[in-house]
Curated annotation (Swiss-Prot):
GO terms for molecular function: nuclear receptor activity; RNA polymerase II cis-regulatory region sequence-specific DNA binding; zinc ion binding. Seam cells, excretory cell, rectal epithelia, chemosensory neurons, gut, head/tail hypodermis. Orphan nuclear receptor that may have a role in dauer formation. A zinc finger (NR C4-type) spans 152-172, 188-212. This is Nuclear hormone receptor family member nhr-41. It is found in: Nucleus. Belongs to the nuclear hormone receptor family. It comes from Caenorhabditis elegans. Residues 149-224 bind DNA. It holds the Pfam family zf-C4. The gene is nhr-41. Keywords: DNA-binding, Metal-binding, Nucleus, Receptor, Transcription, Transcription regulation, Zinc, Zinc-finger.
């Protein structure tokens, strides 16, 4: 156009573009057409036709908004991009009637690629910022956790990890394990508030154990660790290490541990013993019912396991109904009634935990051995049932008989101190501790009562047999053979009391106090025979009056006092069948004879090996 052209009109300057609106008004579109130079008759891709405002079917006007994209991409300062975006805002660019190169897809792809790059850069920068800040936070938390686990909560030494429920060092871990496993009782010489530090932790073991428990170390974790995972592998290891093991390395509770191990492996666990009809139980019972042990007094130096069944003069068949063996004589003599226990030489202090464990173990084995090797020939099933129901009575009588030898009073005092410490640490409730203390007091009271009666070894033996065969419990087995043995034992006890020298001495000291002047009078004269019978009857009655005192005790509490740390969750009734089947003579021949110079303070390795191999 020229200045002389009548159609030329001076155009006002275009208003600024408003990108804040999602849709552009038609007047704005007309004004936008002046931004792009054009020549008449030459349509370009950037000059929309007159019907630009007409909506085209299938085209969404809000599909591409340059204002929003410019704000997101921050490209307001770039005029080229703004022009391209303004051009792509027209939906007719992609219409087939438009002449020109199809620039719309390329522009959209470029813008999308640019937007993706900027978003990727933004995400990368955010990740870098997170990575730069997160290691510091992680390191701080890990350092705090390491700092929390570095010190032992008991003594403050460097901790090696979490042991038995608390972060502790190796020293406190080993100390706690030894104390719980061996049930060692400690006594504080101060006010039970001794400092437990890295440098003073060994001064007071009582306060150290108390602090271990108070800081969260669990004793049940130690007990669970004692149970073997694989019994067969332990048996192989025991067989390989028996030749290299010395007697001083044997633990005090090794006897009952071997019994428990043998019980779990040979008979297939507790179920085989609980079920009397199981084939394993019947097979093992049949193997041992054909063997009758010799009595103690006939040949004590002979290992019964080496004597064939036919060589024993007192052997009887399985179906034998006789209660007493065929050889003549009483059930017990002074030789057969010997009940002797050897005290460990290196642990004779009753306050030593090893002493308590060794004494209780030997006493239980010796009691079962004493009943089994008596001259009474009871069937194996009958003897097993009687021992399961009467083991507590026999064990109490054994404690009374050996009270002076094992220092029962000091032993019970030590056990009381251990129980008191356990109650303070939460192992025992107040009610349970009171019940255990009551049973211990009754043991001391009964020991004084037995000491006043001054029973001999033969009287103790007959008292055990009478109590063993007495039908004074609801679970007692009533059979003709047990009644016959009980009657025979009672009769022989009365005969022994009548003929014993102690009764005659007692009669001469107390009852034969007749003046010479009255001896001439036949009406007031008391013959020695009548006096002897009266005194024997009185002593016999006083001996039998001791049996009801055995009902003072609860078998479960006796197990808690003496055997809780030795047999664990097992019961004495479960162990008894094993003890009956074992060759116990190898333990009590030459190894446990009282007064022999070669008596060993612990059971020898050869005896333990023989027990494992003979079963």
């Amino acid at each position: 156009m020229t200045l002389g052209d009548p159609c030329s009109v001076e155009q006002p300057p275009p208003p600024p573009i408003d990108f804040s609106r999602s849709l552009i008004a038609p007047t704005a579109i007309k004004q936008e057409s002046h931004l792009i130079p054009s020549t008449p008759g030459t349509p370009t891709a950037f000059q929309p036709p007159q019907h630009a405002n007409t909506p085209i079917p299938g085209i969404q006007p809000n599909l591409f908004n340059p204002a929003i994209m410019a704000a997101q991409l921050n490209v307001f300062s770039n005029p080229q991009l703004m022009a391209m975006m303004q051009a792509t805002r027209n939906p007719l660019l992609g219409h087939p009637s438009v002449v020109g190169p199809p620039m719309m897809p390329n522009i959209i792809q470029q813008l999308n690629a640019l937007r993706n790059v900027q978003l990727s850069n933004a995400n990368t920068m955010a990740n870098l910022q997170n990575m730069s800040s997160s290691p510091k936070h992680t390191n701080g938390s890990s350092e705090r956790s390491e700092n929390c686990g570095e010190l032992c909560v008991v003594c403050g030494d460097k901790a090696s990890g979490r042991h038995y429920g608390a972060v502790s060092c190796e020293g406190c871990k080993g100390f706690f394990k030894r104390s719980i496993r061996k049930r060692i009782g400690y006594v504080c010489r101060s006010q039970k508030d001794c400092p437990v530090t890295k440098f003073h932790r060994n001064r007071c073991q009582y306060c150290r154990l108390r602090k271990c428990l108070s800081m969260g170390m669990r004793s049940e974790s130690v007990q669970a660790e004692r149970r073997p995972v694989n019994n067969s592998s332990m048996l192989c290891n025991n067989d390989n290490n028996q030749q290299n093991t010395t007697p001083e390395h044997l633990s005090p509770n090794l006897l009952l541990s071997l019994v428990k191990l043998e019980h779990e492996t040979k008979l297939g666990g507790l179920e085989a013993l609980i079920k009397p009809g199981s084939p394993v139980m019947l097979q093992n019972t049949q193997d041992y019912m054909d063997v009758k042990r010799e009595s103690i007094g006939e040949d004590e130096m002979t290992v019964i396991g080496l004597v064939p069944p036919s060589a024993s003069p007192t052997s009887s068949g399985v179906g034998s109904s006789s209660s007493i063996s065929d050889d003549s004589g009483p059930i017990y003599t002074s030789e057969r009634a010997r009940f002797e226990i050897s005290v460990p030489l290196n642990t004779q202090n009753p306050r030593n935990h090893q002493y308590i464990s060794e004494i209780t173990t030997r006493l239980l084995f010796l009691t079962v051995h004493f009943v089994k090797d008596s001259r009474v020939s009871l069937r194996t099933s009958t003897m097993e049932g009687l021992l399961k129901s009467k083991w507590c009575d026999l064990y109490i009588l054994a404690l009374m008989q050996t009270a002076d030898k094992i220092k029962l009073g000091q032993l019970l005092d030590n056990l009381t101190n251990q129980m008191a410490m356990g109650m303070e640490c939460g192992q025992y409730s107040a009610e349970k501790f009171e019940k255990i203390s009551e049973q211990m007091q009754r043991l001391l009271q009964l020991s004084q009562l037995f000491a006043s009666r001054e029973l001999t070894a033969v009287e103790y033996a007959y008292l055990k047999m009478i109590s063993f065969t007495a039908q004074d419990l609801p679970s007692s087995m009533a059979s003709p053979e047990t009644r016959s043995v009980n009657q025979m034992a009672s009769q022989e006890l009365f005969e022994y009391v009548s003929s014993s020298k102690s009764t005659q001495n007692h009669m001469s000291n107390e009852h034969i106090n007749v003046d010479d002047s009255t001896s001439e009078d036949n009406d007031t004269h008391v013959t020695s025979q009548q006096s002897s019978v009266n005194i024997a009857a009185e002593r016999f009655s006083r001996i039998l009056q001791l049996l009801p005192c055995l009902r003072w005790f609860d078998p479960a509490t006796i197990v808690e006092i003496f055997f809780s740390g030795l047999i664990g969750p097992m019961s004495i009734e479960t162990i008894i069948p094993f003890v009956l089947q074992m060759n116990l003579m190898s333990f009590f021949d030459q190894k446990m004879e009282l007064g022999s110079g070669g008596a060993s303070d612990t059971l020898s390795t050869s005896s333990l090996s023989e027990m494992m191999n003979n079963q």
